[in-house]
């Protein structure tokens, strides 16, 4: 794969890198950076691709991304993905509860 993908949009570059990646050779942040795509841009594009239904999975150790190659790979990732979402929702609830508790203390 060419280092610099000239004439392509950032999304096209991310799609190309993901298409050539797998669990043993994921698309890494270094690959994105070699193609002038920042970490935040890569994450945003990957989020948009996921929202569009593309099965972009990530390694446990945050080494990189690739397209799920089978149902088991996708299910394994989605289990972790959903667990993270549940943890974030619980944390958000605690933050909200803490805020209102502190507001009540101020008003008392």
Functional labels for PLM-detected ranges:
Residues 61-69:
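Minor-groove-contacting beta-hairpin "wing" of winged helix-turn-helix DNA-binding domains
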Residues 77-108:
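Long, low-complexity, charge-rich intrinsically disordered regions
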Residues 69-77:
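Short His/Asp/Glu-rich catalytic/ion-coordination signatures at enzyme active sites or charged loops
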Residues 37-48:
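Short amphipathic alpha-helical interaction segments
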Residues 22-34:
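Short acidic, hydrophobic short linear motifs in intrinsically disordered regions
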Residues 18-24, 52-54:
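Short helix-capping/hinge SLiMs at alpha-helix to coil transitions
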Residues 50-60:
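A short, conserved structural fragment
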Residues 1-15:
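Short alpha-helical segments that sit at the start of domains
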């Amino acid at each position: 794969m060419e280092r610099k993908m000239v004439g392509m949009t950032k999304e096209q570059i991310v799609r190309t890198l993901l298409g050539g990646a797998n669990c043993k050779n994921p698309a890494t942040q270094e690959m994105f950076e070699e193609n002038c795509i920042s970490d935040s841009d890569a994450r945003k594009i990957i989020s948009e691709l996921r929202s569009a239904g593309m099965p972009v999975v990530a390694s446990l150790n945050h080494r990189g991304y690739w397209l799920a190659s089978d149902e088991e790979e996708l299910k394994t990732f989605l289990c972790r993905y959903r667990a993270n979402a549940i943890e974030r929702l619980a944390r958000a609830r605690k933050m909200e509860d803490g805020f209102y508790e502190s507001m009540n203390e101020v008003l008392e």
